[in-house]
Amino acid sequence: MARSLTWGCCPWCLTEEEKTAARIDQEINRILLEQKKQEREELKLLLLGPGESGKSTFIKQMRIIHGVGYSEEDRRAFRLLIYQNIFVSMQAMIDAMDRLQIPFSRPDSKQHASLVMTQDPYKVSTFEKPYAVAMQYLWRDAGIRACYERRREFHLLDSAVYYLSHLERISEDSYIPTAQDVLRSRMPTTGINEYCFSVKKTKLRIVDVGGQRSERRKWIHCFENVIALIYLASLSEYDQCLEENDQENRMEESLALFSTILELPWFKSTSVILFLNKTDILEDKIHTSHLATYFPSFQGPRRDAEAAKSFILDMYARVYASCAEPQDGGRKGSRARRFFAHFTCATDTQSVRSVFKDVRDSVLARYLDEINLL
């Protein structure tokens, strides 16, 4: 009968072969302990979701809540991006007015629109006064407002109404973006972006990948050693089409992407955190855009944001249930995948703070307990 290498016998009682095996055993144990220590020191969460679901905004919130925030110098660096967002938004509405055959209501609007259209948004370096005056005039035009109400029929940044409502402040020469201005800014994520921060002595690394379809092939090497998957989906996209393909409903595409991700082998035992984002936009548009028009199975009352939220959550929950597999008969080392869902408004710092605290207290505590590190 072979002697156990864990016996407390004296070293001279072991053969050379057993001494070698004992050294190897000790080295393996040392490596395993070091790996556990590293796991404890840094945990990785993968942030996924379709384009414009709010992933980058969520990362910005993590920086504000758990990181260094945005200094005046940091915020100043967002000026050009915010100017670009404003020009892109107004030009999108001017283009849409022509396509949707919506007339201007004010006598000088065409002249102001022509001026705005002469500017390349991606070459803006300052917000010159003539453009600011033109946009303020246009934003008061009933035709532009009617076009905005039909925004589901063309691509328009969610931040359009916010920025256009603050044109006077933003167009000032001394303008320095606020934290809220920064949160509302939009730049498509390309490639892989990571952000590290500490919560209760645990370092978290959130990995954000590009949401556009062309970026998804770059995801694969991010899948290893992920303790939880955060999936962001927009509640307000039920009546919108993809920017890449105007024949596909954005919410249906998001549901399909969610299903695809859940089926990937890397996530079979990874907890899933669903953030149904943009509650504020849903609550605004549900009064004029009926959910049942796009999802006929919705039988709830019209203009009821809570009923709409419940229905959309149920669609995602059913996708999750259809992808969930029974555990492998209690196989040692296997972890049960769990599903957590939260409604969020990624531009609301207090809302995100509260939701992420729930995530930390449930998902992270459970994970650390499973690897015996609590």
Curated annotation (Swiss-Prot):
Domain G-alpha: 41-374
Binding site for GTP: 49-56, 183-189, 208-212, 277-280, 346
Region (G5 motif): 344-349
Listed Gene3D superfamilies: GI Alpha 1, domain 2-like, P-loop containing nucleotide triphosphate hydrolases
GO molecular function ontology, one term from the record: GTPase activity
InterPro entries assigned: Gprotein_alpha_Q (IPR000654), Gprotein_alpha_su (IPR001019), GproteinA_insert (IPR011025), P-loop_NTPase (IPR027417)
Stretch list, region G4 motif: 273-280
Region (G2 motif): 181-189
One of the Pfam families matching this protein, by short name: G-alpha
Similarity annotation: Belongs to the G-alpha family. G(q) subfamily.
Function: Guanine nucleotide-binding proteins (G proteins) are involved as modulators or transducers in various transmembrane signaling systems.
Protein name: Guanine nucleotide-binding protein subunit alpha-15
Organism expressing this protein natively: Mus musculus
Gene encoding the protein: Gna15
